[in-house]
Amino acid sequence: MEVRPFGLWPSPLAPGDLAAATRFRDLAWDSDGRTLVWLEGRGPQGILVCQPHGEAPRDLNTTLSVRAQVGYGGGDFAVARGHAYFVEYSGRLYRQALASGPAHPITPEFGSAASPTPSPDGRHLVYVHSDEGRDSLAVVDTEGHHWPQRLVTGADFYMQPAWHPKGDRLAWIEWDHPQMPWDGTRLMLAQLARSRDGLPCLRNKTTLAGDIDTVVAQPHFSPNGRHLVYASDQRGHSNLWLRDLASGETRCLSEDAHDVAGPAWIQGLRAFSFSADSHTLYFIRGENSQRRAHSLNLQTGTITPILALAGYSHI
């Protein structure tokens, strides 16, 4: 038997095999729940793949590489109303119909973009923008007819913008130097108005949660618009919190020694989401060094494991 030092035995895999491997990055449903879109890394390229219900999967395009580059990346694309909105490697935002046709740029080529988030009516897109060390939340119309505008400025970093279902409010996460997003962040909420050119503009900005020693993450409005759910470690672990938007009352939904939201190394992370009727929250949390899926009945507070989704890490 041949003996070789550790790490020097022959391998059937060459470096080229690893570089050419397909990597699964993220996925999203279209608004109708019948078309699934996901992002594959194929060598140096990021390719969006689309699969309508009952049909074979197909590449949306192979000429543009999908890759967001704000911070450590992530938040590469979104899907809504029959269209995919994605960040191309150059930093431009594109819109492409899921049915057919080419992709069309909707922002000019400057800076970097991430986390494109379509408005409920499909007319506007809020996204994280970074240019020459200056970060902001920007807004542009989804047809690309107007020059994009800065919507939110003042903080050093931004992530996870979220529209209220009525389109009249926006929530997001922000933080400043020297904090990292796993040290201390702020959950912000603002009313939206319309500017003269029709783009949304900000008013009545409020800090809802978080500080330099508390991490809040992943704001998510309920489909009926009554509640805002987010993760916060204000009691030691990253638990789920629910805010009643009418009364302002906030309560912890999962006060236990399990973490729901992990460190936000990248944009676009998701660990929980609502059911369509707003009555149930589905989430993934760490238990015994594993990530496990659960459902939470918001009326009874009952938490139930989802055994069929064992091993899933994001929702």
Predicted regions and their residues:
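Short coil/turn segments that connect the beta-strands within blades of beta-propeller domains
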Residues: 32-34, 81-82, 121-123, 166-168, ...
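Repeat-blade elements of multi-bladed beta-propeller folds
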Residues: 74-82, 128, 273
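A short beta-strand motif characteristic of beta-propeller blades
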Residues: 10-18, 57-67, 102-107, 147-152, ...
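A flexible loop/linker signature enriched in serine peptidases of the S9 family
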Residues: 40-48, 65-71, 85-94, 108-113, ...
